[in-house]
Amino acid sequence: MQSSLKKSLYLGLAALSFAGVAAVSTTASAKSYATAGAYSTLKTDAATRNVEATGTNALYTKPGTVKGAKVVASKATMAKLASSKKSADYFRAYGVKTTNRGSVYYRVVTMDGKYRGYVYGGKSDTAFAGGIKSAETTTKADMPARTTGFYLTDTSKNTLWTAPKYTQYKASKVSLYGVAKDTKFTVDQAATKTREGSLYYHVTATNGSGISGWIYAGKGFSTTATGTQVLGGLSTDKSVTATNDNSVKIVYRTTDGTQVGSNTWVTSTDGTKAGSKVSDKAADQTALEAYINANKPSGYTVTNPNAADATYGNTVYATVSQAATSKVALKVSGTPVTTALTTADANDKVAANDTTANGSSVAGSTVYAAGTKLAQLTTDLTGEKGQVVTLTAIDTDLEDATFTGTTTYYSDLGKAYHYTYTYNKDSAASSNASTQFGSNVTGTLTATLVMGKSTATANGTTWFN
């Protein structure tokens, strides 16, 4: 009897001990999770709540330290979104929760709606930190030299947006009801998509309809181009439907007859007829040839537009060749100029001067270039593959340019110096007598040693090796 009682007591105590351990374990497990406070909707201006991932935290279905939180986008995925070159991968923050541990989690969604969830945002519900940071989805761009007299290139295809697509959450198309092919627009803002770099103009219709919005503007308006300019969805001439009476088909083909592209040029001149020569109106002839050159297939250059005898309703066969683009390899000619320095400073230049001796290279990644004709340089560095470059055009683009080195050097006495450069046209001529498009053009520079730190930011990789 006693033995049976003892055994029952032991079993009872064991059961109680197990239950106690289970209770402690459950309590400890519960304490390992945070609890989230009430959800709050963010009410500040929506554009100020555009953010981008930093790649340091994952995205969850609920605050990440709360029980039941599941991963929506891993830390690795968020890192990819952080380094993305697509505006669609920005986020919009629209809500917030704070845990009992003081951690703030923002409710966010990507601009394309693909990812939505909570991401750790630091310890403040008024500033973005942790897994996200504020983002400027667009960057202000220079206004075009011409702001009036634009038309939609094709009213059936081109449209306006409330914001450049994916730069604001739920950016949408603008209704074009009331817009005709001859509706004029005025440009009142210009911006680029920060990640893609693509240019957009904000335009407003001048017909009193109040219609306005953003539209892709291609390379933007050019002050040097002749004839009609097509800027993405905008044109400097009204939209006209192509017919035999007002258009010329252009076929681009190589010297062996291989077709590599085609296009259609349409005149905005009234009264033209099928079979009549385009050259009957000098302005139209100029516009046609400019169009042929401007709309050539990618990777080709026009060697002969063959447009002299073009007639409306017929085809022009423009001859093209493979194009090649050179870059300029900058080199120092002679010893650096030090005349602007005091005698004491000139004697202290040795440590800095060692890096820029006669014949040394100047990388495009270490120089800031400025000049009124640099925009033309890419065009002048592109030509028919195998042909000798036209150095006179390149000289013209570079001779008024100034170059500032971005590197700061220190002398033996600890003084700061940097270099500025000017283009040496005469030395360049002797170095490029037989340089062909696609090969580096040697650009010789005269270097000047300047006292003080460099504050310039490199921009030279577009044109210079």
Swiss-Prot record:
**Gene Ontology CC annotations of this record:** extracellular region; S-layer
Out of the domains of life, which is the source?
Bacteria
- Main localization is secreted
Signal peptide positions are 1-30
The protein's PTM annotation reads: Glycosylated.
Q: Which UniProt keywords apply?
A: Cell wall, Glycoprotein, S-layer, Secreted, Signal
Q: Where in the cell is it found?
A: Secreted, Cell wall, S-layer
Q: List the disulfide bonds.
A: none
Q: Does the keyword Secreted apply?
A: yes
What is its biological role? Answer: S-layer protein. The S-layer is a paracrystalline mono-layered assembly of proteins which coats the surface of bacteria.
Protein name (Swiss-Prot/TrEMBL): S-layer protein
- The species this protein was found in: Levilactobacillus brevis
